A protein has these predicted regions:
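Active-site-proximal alpha-helix that buttresses catalytic centers in soluble enzyme cores
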Residues: 2, 7, 11-74, 115
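A secondary-structure boundary/capping signal
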Residues: 8, 78, 143-144
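Glycine-rich, flexible loop/turn motifs
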Residues: 16, 22-24, 78-86, 107, ...
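Short aromatic-enriched loop/helix-cap "lid" or pocket-rim segments at secondary-structure transitions
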Residues: 16-19, 65, 88-92, 154
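Short beta->alpha junction loops/turns
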Residues: 25, 58, 83, 144-145
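Short beta-strand scaffold positions
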Residues: 55-56, 122, 142-143
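Phosphate-handling substructures
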Residues: 68-125
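Active-site-adjacent alpha-helix immediately C-terminal to a catalytic or transition-state-stabilizing loop
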Residues: 70, 125-182
Length: 183
């Protein structure tokens, strides 16, 4: 049965500044570039076998994926559905703002010109369904924290508060199996 590995991009400038990045195209910091290299080395050292790396077109994820691909020798291609959620009016605002936290409780909210969590889930679930239909295939997805939440929710039931609280560190590697078990 196929697997999916998920890697969150390396540290970005707005991660350091504690700002909501969302669909805004913010670059990696030098630390982020180092994290990407270390993650590629970790994937190679662990002997993770994958057919392909799929990555978000936003530069922080694309640069992370390219570094991993260079080190592992795996083919990599852009997958637009892995773009981070557009948080509309909240982009570039403090990540820990109380108003934003309340806004996230409404999964149908498009954040004043952004994208609702339900729309994000639709595109990510469609991608994962396509990958699941290829049972002998394993992919590494390189994307964003918001996308990590949706991927996790595909493989595991979560309450709304668990979903909102779930987070992945920069360049953390998660493993999911289509046999129904998150590892």
């Amino acid at each position: 049965m196929g697997k999916v590995y998920f890697v969150r991009h390396g540290q970005s400038l707005w991660n350091v500044e504690n700002k909501i990045c969302g669909a805004t195209d913010i670059p990696l910091t030098e630390t982020g570039h180092r994290q990407a290299i270390e993650t590629g080395e970790k994937i190679r050292a662990l002997g993770i076998q994958a057919d392909e790396i799929l990555y978000s077109p936003l530069q922080r994820a694309a640069d992370t994926a390219r570094r991993i691909a260079e080190i592992t020798g795996l083919p990599a291609r852009e997958e637009p559905r892995l773009t981070e959620q557009n948080f509309g009016v909240w982009e570039s605002t403090p990540r820990d703002g109380a108003e934003f936290r309340r806004a996230k409780e409404n999964f149908c909210c498009s954040y004043g010109g952004g994208e609702s969590m339900l729309r994000v889930a639709q595109r990510i679930y469609n991608l994962l369904d396509e990958l699941r239909a290829q049972p002998d295939r394993t992919c590494i997805l390189v994307a964003h924290n918001g996308i990590a939440r949706v991927v996790k929710s595909y493989f595991s039931d979560m309450t709304n508060s668990e979903y909102a609280a779930f987070g992945v560190k920069n360049c953390e590697v998660l493993e999911f199996s289509f046999d129904g078990k998150a590892e």
